[in-house]
Amino acid sequence: MKPISTIQWARLTLFVAALGMAANGPAQEAKRGSSYSPVVIKEDFATTMARMAAEKPVVMKRQMDLLNERYDLSDRPVPGVAMSRGKPVQGDVRVKLQAGTTWESLAAQTPEEIRAQGSWPAGFYPLPHPKQADGGMTFPRFVIDEIIKQEGRDLTRFDVDFDLPDLFLPEFPAGIYLTTRPDLGDVSQGKLVTLFNYYELFNGILNPKQLEGLRLLVTSFPQQQFNQTEDRRSVKPSRGVTCFDCHANGHTDATTHLVGDIRPQEHRHRIGTPTLRGVNVQRLFGSQRALKSVEDFTEFEQRAAYFDGDPVIATKKGANILERGSQVHSMAEFQALLDFPPAPKLGITGLLDPRKASKRELQGQALFMGKAQCATCHAPPYYTDNSMHNLKVERFFKPKMINGRLASADGPIKTFPLRGIKDSPPYLHDDRLLTLDDTVEFFNLVLELKLSATEKADLVAFMQAL
């Protein structure tokens, strides 16, 4: 047998290396996962539903255990403070601290010290979806019940329920205030606007184009979890969801979802549904997507967000492609009529009228514009700069897995308007902050402000007046 030459050894080495790369390539791809959801479902629907329904109690117990570990969920409304239609506003800091820790001692530490000690409050970590592994639209029970009552359309999921207590959610149904008819005040008549009553409520108040836009906003179309295929999370085939199922009465009912613009699943942020009030003064839409008009966002929602940003799945389940020049524009025109709720203590410039405001509210306003640095981003009169900012909260903690959500860097997030803020709890983009008191404590740490207890209370009082 002839000895193998140097050239032959080199060729053999390259061949073996190529085999190794071919073997490792698929393994690495499998480890990384795919951007796409499976289109062909191998399991029959009855088996899927039975399996997920059996898992549901475990899923919900894990999420509720997390909420109780993170928060004080008791009923403690703020005396004399209510939302626009009368629902009590919950007060006090609800995020729990580790034993032996105080807010003052935390505020005295640097981000590096808090990170090293692992003392970042549990309630300040990103809040996972109640079922992070699947995500998807998950509605509060009171929303589901009212839509069943009016339309017979069931938004119950057999695999998961909404998690946050009703105490900490916006009032339902919310008031509707129109920029074109401020003389009418709340035009909702205390009703949830649906396809079954929108015409009788708004005929004679809106023009025909706006009325058509509202009709489309309350018309259901297929969505990732609610559709007619075997890949759904409703017991029966579903007609889908409407824009106003989440943005109830043009406001928010706190329905949750996951952002569609991130992969893999453990990195996807929970979404707290934002209000549509005041979209006429906003120029950025989506917490991170930076869409530039409400027309863009309206079109994007049904083309992509309804289906987790997956156009392949959207084609299978029935994406509703809106026509830009008529349908999208009509929907956007109605949305642009949705005004902020009345704020009787604010003057023309969006600042407090000293003749109407309390001493505490005026002190809070001075802090908001000065020491607390709030107005750097949340500038009057609508308390937004129409921009995006990265708070870099990951300075304070090491990445960790929380119920399937990898808590790490969030990146830049849109500056949402604070006008009418008491009407739209919970707070932050993923609803991790249950009250305005929680929100002030969060930013006191993140911005390293070292505010006193009195200063923090003054800030809350000011925001309740917006």
Could you describe each region identified by the protein language model?
Residues K2-T13:
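Bacterial N-terminal signal peptides that target proteins for export
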Residues A27-L466:
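Periplasmic c-type cytochrome electron-transfer domains
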